[in-house]
Amino acid sequence: MIDRQQILNELISPNSSKIVLLVMDGIGDIPGEDGLTPLQKANTPKLDELAKQSDLGQTIPVLPGITPGSGPGHLGIFGYDPLKYQIGRGILEALGIDVEVGEKDLVARGNFATLEGDIIVDRRAGRPSSEESAKVVEILNENIHKIEDVEVKFYPGKEHRFVVKLTGEGLYDKLEDADPQKEGKPIKYTKALDESSKKSEKIINILIDRIKEVLKDQQKMNFALLRGFSKYPNLPSFGDVYKLRPAAIAVYPMYKGLAKLVGMEILKTGQTIEDEFKTVKENWEKYDFFYVHVKKTDSYGEDGNFESKVKVIEEVDKNLGLLLELKPDVLIVTGDHSTPCAMKGHSFHPVPLMIYSKFTRKGLSKLYNEFECARGTLGTIPAVDVMSLALAYAGRLEKYGA
């Protein structure tokens, strides 16, 4: 198998260029009732003007037809082959909220959910506020401390999300998610995928029943779905591989966790897109690579809220000048996967990609949307090749071979 990162590392010639990777989570979509996607419907004069000066294309996050999770989707655009580096959502969420994870620990991402009888009727418990969710996490910590010889600790995340950490001997992460992924389905318990994870299966399934018992009197957050069981993985450092000083700007814990896992510096920022873009400006001289994450495009796609997804795209466009005035040598606008509103979830569809640089061919595309990207100069490429293009457009790659 070709080791892309090793080849790139040998070709890199550092310079003073600056690269910005703007990820609008779940940006790709399919036409709605009026025949337009949210990107087409949105009023985006800055993105469209940028498209005229850029090379456009689309990415395949993992393989054609494969629907990626957020972890594989991001690893791909960071240049890590998601088929080689398989990482559970739990470790990403845990690192994103600064949970310390050791070699005896097994972590999982939790969603508070609403249960009627044994049927999941809301996988996100009505999207409670982070403050409401934290109170329920406290109830869990007060009532569940240990299962057999395994210590249990819960940590609040953002909105309906939390992290559970199990600490003990012989815990492994080859496990199915304890999440049916759809509403209207019964409780799903985890199942070990190999013999080494049988103990983990037993402990987690007892834990699920304990959570159900403890939360039975809660109105909406009366159950929890657990997924992304994971140990701490070791990944090559992004900075070392690409000879860059990388920084990450994200609001949601999981994406901070992803960035931290590959060795990016996590910058403090506010809650809005404007705050995030201003954080880039404030730190412009300290780093030469900025990963900026916008979450709500994905959230509204999952909710099936077409108009709200349009508004988030327009908010990105409204504030894009904050990035453009910095005059980055390379500005990449893309997503980690598609989240069509009609499907209310991640999908297999290719992801729009736009790369701005003074070295682009430009001239073919007039707008930034799925269909302009599909016919763009970059073609359809694996997401794992985005970083090599970023480095090339930044003038950081030497010639390969004689």
Swiss-Prot record:
InterPro entries: Alkaline_phosphatase_core_sf, ApgAM_prokaryotes, Metalloenzyme, Pglycerate_mutase_ApgM, Pglycerate_mutase_ApgM_sf. Belongs to the BPG-independent phosphoglycerate mutase family. A-PGAM subfamily. Pathway: Carbohydrate degradation; glycolysis; pyruvate from D-glyceraldehyde 3-phosphate: step 3/5. Pfam families: Metalloenzyme, PhosphMutase. Gene3D superfamilies: Alkaline Phosphatase, subunit A (3.40.720.10), Metalloenzyme domain (3.30.70.2130). It is an enzyme of class 5 (isomerase). Its EC number is 5.4.2.12. HAMAP family: ApgM_B (MF_01402_B). It catalyses: (2R)-2-phosphoglycerate = (2R)-3-phosphoglycerate. Keywords: Glycolysis, Isomerase. It comes from the Bacteria. Catalyzes the interconversion of 2-phosphoglycerate and 3-phosphoglycerate. One of its GO terms (biological process) is glycolytic process. This is Probable 2,3-bisphosphoglycerate-independent phosphoglycerate mutase. PANTHER family: COFACTOR-INDEPENDENT PHOSPHOGLYCERATE MUTASE, METALLOENZYME DOMAIN-CONTAINING PROTEIN. The keyword Isomerase applies. GO terms for molecular function: metal ion binding; phosphoglycerate mutase activity. Signal peptide: none annotated. NCBIfam families: apgM, PRK04135.1.
